Amino acid sequence: MATLHAPAFELPEILNTKTNLADARIGAQVIECSDDFFAEAKRMLQFEAPIFVEDKFDDHGKWMDGWETRRKRHAGYDWCIVKLGVSGKISALDIDTTFFTGNYPASASLEACYAPNGDLTGVTWQSILENTELGPSQHHIFMVNNDAIFTHIRLNIFPDGGVARLRVYGDVHIQVTDHEQTLDLLALENGGRVIAYSDAHFGHPRNLINPGRGVNMGDGWETKRRRAPGYDWCILALGKSGKIEKIEIDTAHFKGNFPAEVSIQAVYLENATDAQLIPQSMFWSYLLEAQPMQMDHIHEYVNEILKHEKISHIRINMIPDGGISRVRLWGKIAKS
């Protein structure tokens, strides 16, 4: 059986530093749906790009990599409620119908609500996307102008059909405020985010702050082979400023392509724009001087951490190039 892979798709640059709040890897899950006879709704939340396997059928018909409902024979429409992996502000939507050609929905709308306790009884759903026409086998990017914090979304498809992937791009809302608790201040679920990077040819630096260890080499930050002097770097913002007690640099799955060394610079800045940070970052003080890397290994540093006060941003320098899977900054949230 031949397997077709989704065509390459370049996300609009404005969304490169946003988080997919509906990513199953960070805990997004389907709560309820009207129907998923042909293909389970949870497939729509997978990180991997959709595939099409020719001649693959199951007991319900043609196997499809996404959410697909049966043909509607009465009035109405289909819907799916998703709990976001982390609450946050929604900046954009990607309703992807890749490989759904004669079975894509005619149109779709999306609503969102805030229900931190998970109880959706009596919640107020806000319209994020009005009913909008969809096309076959393509990405549909919709920008959202709404500053509210949301925990759940409801995708409505009219009247029925299939969606390969649903991605909800936005900024994580930080809920942790305990100043005595030690936590990963850089973690995605705690509000960490990517600001800028020198290169992301093989893997995006947003993977550095994902939960758990990397599942493969593609689940990390990897740059192209450097053919000129210098090194690669990325700038990240902590979810909350704090003082760092322990650093972890994980090169899981990187064996012939791990960097020779990694160093970390840091700074505390209030109200700085992302554009301001990039040229200033090369002058930030070192939090961790260049450390030699090993392949496929978790490197832990405590005594090597240099004296510092609270920090809000870091710059990771990967010398000269290569790939790392995860970076963890364990510490406590700074008191105001």
Swiss-Prot record:
SUPFAM superfamilies: Galactose-binding domain-like (SSF49785). Keywords: Hydrolase, Purine metabolism. It is an enzyme of class 3 (hydrolase). It catalyses: allantoate + H2O = (S)-ureidoglycolate + urea. GO terms for molecular function: allantoicase activity. Its EC number is 3.5.3.4. It comes from the Bacteria. It holds the Pfam family Allantoicase. One of its GO terms (biological process) is purine nucleobase metabolic process. Pathway: Nitrogen metabolism; (S)-allantoin degradation; (S)-ureidoglycolate from allantoate (aminidohydrolase route): step 1/1. Belongs to the allantoicase family. NCBIfam families: allantoicase. This is Probable allantoicase.
